[in-house]
Design a protein with these regions (language model features):
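Conserved beta-strand scaffold positions in the cores of enzyme catalytic domains, especially
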Residues: 35, 49, 98, 147, ...
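Active-site beta-strand termini and strand-to-loop segments that position acidic
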Residues: 50-54, 225
Length: 370
């Protein structure tokens, strides 16, 4: 069945919203899928999994191995909702095993690492953490035909003309020579299909990650074990800091990927190389022609601002604290928001701790004008 993107609201899981997604957030939806507790985190939080489908082709999917990367978790539940309510025939060809939050401690604390401050995506060989050992155990037992590794990427990623990288993909290397092994070609072929489909929706906003080999990364390890593995990265769109727009596009990408595998819609793997590689030329805000105090006078300069993500445990929401990132000509840098301060008469003393607050006050004024 062809995906009708206008139907998104019909299968979107509206209970999930924002950036702070934990076991508690997903529990109501999860409970409808007959989940089981596959293991426990360092702090003994349950790591849930569920399965659906009776097809011979097995796909293992995990999300939030980095606890603060939650967009793909929302998209994953939207995708499952689509399959079960709109296109259940897919499950005759495939079977899904899903771990929606592999790192529940990191999700709770809104940290990349687990409770022991270990990056689970650098623990694929040593397997020092219970979460890593669980994923490997499920992989070894299931022997999947495909693996989907779901992540979020920072707002810095860009493509040509400073366009935002809203989606990124990677077929991980399986060796230092980046050889096109059979498993790697298969994952490239799936990505090529998704790229062709998604380029009709967000042309110019899809990127490809660097494929330098690191056996400590889970995707590289599974690819080296001859399992086609795909990295999905949820990127940023304009001022959508809750990542609800990106969520939708990741959902579509997951659906296209599963349809590709179920219906054998694989494209020429060489098309994978047509996806532009990600650059890191974006910031959250770029301000040009800002007057900065310099001794007894001032100078005109440019600066960039990045938001630091902070968990407010009272409201259980993520707050975005602005911080000055760079100052200078910054010709090779842009922003998701670019503002010209030439009409702002204020001279900003960047040595004062409240200078960023004054800058943001004027940012908001200019945004209201425009």
């Amino acid at each position: 069945m062809e995906l009708n993107i206008k139907d998104y609201k019909k299968f979107k899981e509206n209970d999930l919203f924002g950036r702070y997604i934990t076991n508690d957030s997903i529990y109501r939806i999860l409970s409808t899928y007959s989940p089981k507790i596959s293991g426990y985190s360092v702090q003994k939080r349950p790591i849930y999994s569920f399965s659906c489908g009776s097809g011979k082709t097995k796909i293992l999917i995990w999300s939030q191995m980095h606890g603060n990367e939650s967009t793909s978790t929302k998209a994953l539940f939207d995708c499952i909702s689509y399959i079960l309510t709109i296109d259940p025939s897919l499950l005759d060809s495939i079977s899904l095993t899903v771990l929606p939050i592999l790192n529940p401690d990191g999700a709770f604390e809104y940290t990349r690492e687990n409770y022991n401050k270990i990056d689970l995506n650098r623990d694929a060989v040593d397997l020092t953490q219970p979460e890593s050992r669980l994923l490997r155990s499920i992989y070894d037992t299931l022997k999947p035909h495909f693996c989907f590794n779901l992540h979020d990427q920072r707002t810095i990623y860009s493509l040509n003309n400073f366009d935002s990288s809203i989606l990124s993909f990677l077929s991980p290397s399986s060796d230092k020579n980046k050889l096109e092994t059979e498993s790697r070609i298969k994952s490239m072929s799936v990505i090529s299909h998704v790229y062709e489909s998604m380029s009709k929706i967000i042309p110019g906003n899809i990127g490809r990650y660097n494929d330098d080999f690191n056996i400590n990364c889970v995707g590289d390890t599974f690819q080296s074990l001859k399992t086609p593995t795909i990295l999905f990265e949820s990127g940023h769109y304009n001022d959508d800091y809750n990542r609800e727009v990106s969520r939708k596009y990741v959902c579509f990408s997951l659906i296209y990927s599963i349809q590709c595998i179920a219906n054998k819609l694989f494209k020429d793997h060489n098309n994978y190389y047509n996806i532009p590689e990600n650059k890191t030329q974006l910031t959250d805000i770029k301000i040009v022609n800002i007057k900065v105090k310099q001794k007894s006078t001032f100078k005109l300069t440019n600066l960039t601002i990045m938001f630091k993500e902070i968990l407010n445990k009272e409201t259980q929401t993520i707050e975005f604290k602005p911080e000055i990132n760079e100052i200078g000509t910054l010709l090779n840098t842009s922003g998701h928001l670019v503002l010209d301060f030439k009409i702002i008469d204020t001279i900003f003393d960047l040595t004062k701790p409240n200078s960023i607050d004054n800058i943001i006050l004027n940012v908001n004024k200019l945004r209201n004008i425009h």
